[in-house]
Curated annotation (Swiss-Prot):
SUPFAM superfamilies: Trm112p-like. InterPro entries: Trm112, Trm112-like. GO terms for cellular component: cytoplasm; nucleoplasm; nucleus; perinuclear region of cytoplasm; tRNA (m2G10) methyltransferase complex. It comes from Dictyostelium discoideum (Social amoeba). Belongs to the TRM112 family. It is found in: Nucleus, Nucleoplasm; Cytoplasm, Perinuclear region. This is Multifunctional methyltransferase subunit TRM112-like protein. Keywords: Cytoplasm, Nucleus. GO terms for molecular function: protein heterodimerization activity; tRNA methyltransferase activator activity.
Length: 128
């Protein structure tokens, strides 16, 4: 799971609508991919990012990033390269995502987060 994917994900439980974001990442295995820096992509994704989530991830994975989210950052190529590296090159292979609201843990296996609810969770939500 790339960090860009993580930044767009939220808890799937009904009770967490609007509150289950950003998910906390725990990683037992991660890799750094080598992808060419894409200036236009990074510049265009910039306004869609959740900066609280980016700050937590950058600290967790020790990727220092300037968290000044002013417009001049879009002209700073070094900042955009670091952001691109964090979003597109860092991939969590195994680990978990935890909802900050309900504490539901979603496993990550082979780079794929499993966001499906268990059968008992589905029936519980139907009853509510």
């Amino acid at each position: 799971m790339k960090i860009l994917t993580h930044n767009m994900m939220a808890c799937t439980k009904k009770q967490c609508m609007g509150k289950g974001f950003p998910l906390k990442v725990e990683s037992t295995e991660q890799i750094v991919l080598e992808q060419e820096f894409n200036y236009e992509f990074t510049k265009n994704i910039y306004p869609k990012l959740d900066w609280l989530g980016i700050a937590e991830i950058s600290i967790k994975f020790n990727i220092p990033i300037q968290l000044d989210t002013t417009k001049h950052s879009l002209e700073d190529e070094e900042f955009l390269k670091t952001l691109h590296n964090l979003l597109c090159n860092l991939k969590v292979i195994t680990g978990s995502l935890t909802c900050p609201n309900c504490q539901r843990v979603y496993p990550i296996d082979k780079g794929i987060p499993n966001m499906l609810l268990r059968e008992d969770e589905i029936y519980q939500e139907i009853k509510e």
